[in-house]
């Protein structure tokens, strides 16, 4: 079952409602520096009553190999159970991505050292500095690990909120799929 039933929370797309507009993926990228952390591919459950897809996104596992394997303390579990990458200490070494059995961690280029949002540009403001960690030798780390953070610092999950048909939602698999025997 590719770990679907063991995860704390699963992103689910009702394929009977999905119109393949990519709003979910675009909305994710809009709040994650242009990087969508959602891939609309994954296992499907197709029965007479449901046509459900499980897009690739972080499982926020009970026993996360990425978290326990990180040598730089760049990952933590939040008080509400989500796995979070700490950008300030992430070296971009790729170990967490290699350890993730579900391939849900992406290695992305770090932002430049300044970041100007569109409102800043519109108002003619100076870009705000972005912290870029460096190695003990002064080398700047060029990559950053990213995974679905459930938009915990936002009032809603952007992918879910921006779906025009309500096709995408999060569930606790052990409750939602009681009695389901196989997911292909």
Regions found by a protein language model. Give the residues of each.
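Short Cys/His-rich zinc-binding micro-motifs
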Residues: 18, 59-61, 90, 148-155
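Short, conserved phosphate-binding/catalytic loop or strand-edge motifs used
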Residues: 43-46
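Flexible inter-domain linker/hinge segments
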Residues: 1-8
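Local sequence-structure signature of Cys/Sec-based thiol-disulfide redox active-site neighborhoods
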Residues: 11-15
């Amino acid at each position: 079952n590719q770990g679907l039933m063991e995860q704390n929370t699963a992103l689910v797309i009702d394929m009977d409602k999905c119109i393949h507009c990519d709003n979910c993926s675009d909305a994710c990228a809009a709040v994650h520096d242009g990087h969508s952390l959602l891939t609309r591919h994954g296992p499907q459950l197709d029965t007479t009553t449901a046509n459900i897809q499980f897009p690739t996104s972080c499982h926020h596992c009970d026993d996360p190999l990425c978290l326990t394997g990180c040598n730089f303390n760049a990952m933590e579990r939040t008080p509400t159970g989500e796995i979070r990458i700490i950008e300030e200490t992430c070296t971009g070494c790729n170990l967490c991505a290699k350890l993730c059995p579900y391939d849900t961690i992406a290695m992305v280029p770090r932002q430049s050292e300044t970041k100007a949002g569109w409102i800043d540009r519109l108002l003619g403001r100076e870009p705000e500095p972005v912290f870029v960690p460096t190695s003990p030798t002064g080398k700047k780390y060029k990559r950053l690990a990213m995974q679905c953070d459930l938009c915990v610092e936002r009032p809603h999950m952007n992918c879910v909120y921006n779906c025009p048909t309500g096709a995408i939602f999060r569930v606790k698999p052990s409750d939602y799929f009681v009695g389901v025997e196989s997911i292909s």
